[in-house]
Amino acid sequence: MTVHVTGCSTATADQLVSREIRTESGQREVFCGLTGIVWLHRKIQDAFFLVVGSRTCAHLVQSAAGVMIFAEPRFGTAIMEEKDLAGLTDANDELDRVVTQLLARRPDIKLLFLVGSCPSEVIKLDLSRAALRLSQRFSPGVRILNYSGSGIETTFTQGEDACLASLVPELPAQTDTKPSLLVVGSLADVVEDQFARMFEALGVGNVAFFPPRKSTALPSVGPNTKILMAQPFLPDTVRALEERGAKRLAAPFPLGVEGTTGWLRAAADAFGVDPAKFEQVTAPNRARAERALSAFKSELGGRRIFFFPDSQLEIPLARFLSRELDMQLVEVATPYLHREHLAEELKLLPIEVALTEGQDVDDQLDRCRIARPDIVVCGLGLANPLEAEGITTKWSIELVFTPIQGYEQAADLAELFARPLVRRAKLVA
């Protein structure tokens, strides 16, 4: 249950502690972590993602990526047949054969991820030992790591978290005593370039992004590294970096004008940037983004929105939509709510908003139908049934695939929510 308070003020630190959050643990509707390969294989340009799984796994990744297999993308599936699942063949021998063929055919691969799936975990195939064995065979030319993309008790963005966490032990130790900034979480190249220019203009030096575009250019990490999270779904990665001595900067996430400004300010404050310089550098970008957002307020202002738990972006998105576009939050549900990493976001949410962690899909569907919101953010599996009931939807997975961070993308993010409403209005007219 949620404590309802009159007014729309934001939460204080004391109210955050006392705010009740509904927790649910029933049936869920989510994709598995294999989906993360869709954006990770584009980000790390010399890496290959080899899923050890079933034909269903192969169809999921290929369909989600929208890439024809003859285009030779940087992902593939070592398909487990019935004889593998029945234990009639040595799965390790088969895996060694597939990896050898792959690396002979694709000499451009410098980093190979063996990605576990539900089938490989069911038969207890030890991909960590396989990765170690194959690394010894193919090093130093190819680094081979493993992580799980299984959908057993996970949601789809956890695939990136597992991938990056597996890469943290490979990061070189920091030797420079000067402080460095590590931006953690996959960003579109265009967004990464924008942030790099912004940090340079602010005078924040020694900035690196993780994951990098090339696995041969891994950033260093150590006690002088400050972490700035670009995505909210990376708790295991951040924990692994903190174990290496890095320190996380508390900040909202860079969605919208307010979030981007708070995110940049956290870095600027940590690196001693003069407030006047921060204002000088960011003011033109803020003003331009605010003008662009104003075009969508008439369409989105006052509209009621309901979030099903799917991407773990729900809370930063809700903050952006309520505070910058005047949308009304009916319910904001997220698969996992990391109180520490999302503390700055929770402070900015209206204190009366209904927050839910986890999902019991039938109960949540009932609440959604009773509320009849103007738009629902949900996974693909729920979108079509809700549309058939006359409820406008926005696919949450599209918000992960699309560049939405930073000042320049603020209006693009708003348009993603306005577009379904405009489409519905045209269909009804």
Swiss-Prot record:
Pathway given for this chain reads: Porphyrin-containing compound metabolism; bacteriochlorophyll biosynthesis (light-independent)
What keyword terms does UniProt attach to this protein?
4Fe-4S, ATP-binding, Bacteriochlorophyll biosynthesis, Chlorophyll biosynthesis, Iron, Iron-sulfur, Metal-binding, Nucleotide-binding, Oxidoreductase, Photosynthesis
- Tell me how the cofactor is bound: Binds 1 [4Fe-4S] cluster per heterodimer. The cluster is bound at the heterodimer interface by residues from both subunits.
Tell me which residues bind [4Fe-4S] cluster. C32, C57, C118
> What's the Enzyme Commission number for this chain?
1.3.7.7
Which enzyme class? oxidoreductase
**Gene Ontology terms: biological process:** light-independent bacteriochlorophyll biosynthetic process; photosynthesis, dark reaction
Q: Cross-referenced InterPro entries, in alphabetical order?
A: LIPOR_BchN/ChlN, Nase/OxRdtase_comp1, Protochl_reductN
- What's an example of a GO molecular-function annotation for this chain? metal ion binding
Required cofactor(s) = [4Fe-4S] cluster
- Taking the record's annotation, the residue ranges forming a coiled coil are none
One Pfam assignment: Oxidored_nitro
Q: Give the reactions, separated by semicolons, that this protein catalyses.
A: chlorophyllide a + oxidized 2[4Fe-4S]-[ferredoxin] + 2 ADP + 2 phosphate = protochlorophyllide a + reduced 2[4Fe-4S]-[ferredoxin] + 2 ATP + 2 H2O
What is known about its subunit structure? Protochlorophyllide reductase is composed of three subunits; BchL, BchN and BchB. Forms a heterotetramer of two BchB and two BchN subunits.
Q: Which family does it belong to?
A: Belongs to the BchN/ChlN family.
Q: What does this protein do?
A: Component of the dark-operative protochlorophyllide reductase (DPOR) that uses Mg-ATP and reduced ferredoxin to reduce ring D of protochlorophyllide (Pchlide) to form chlorophyllide a (Chlide). This reaction is light-independent. The NB-protein (BchN-BchB) is the catalytic component of the complex.
What is this protein's record name?
Light-independent protochlorophyllide reductase subunit N
Query: Which species?
Result: Rhodopseudomonas palustris (strain ATCC BAA-98 / CGA009)
Gene encoding this chain?
Answer: bchN
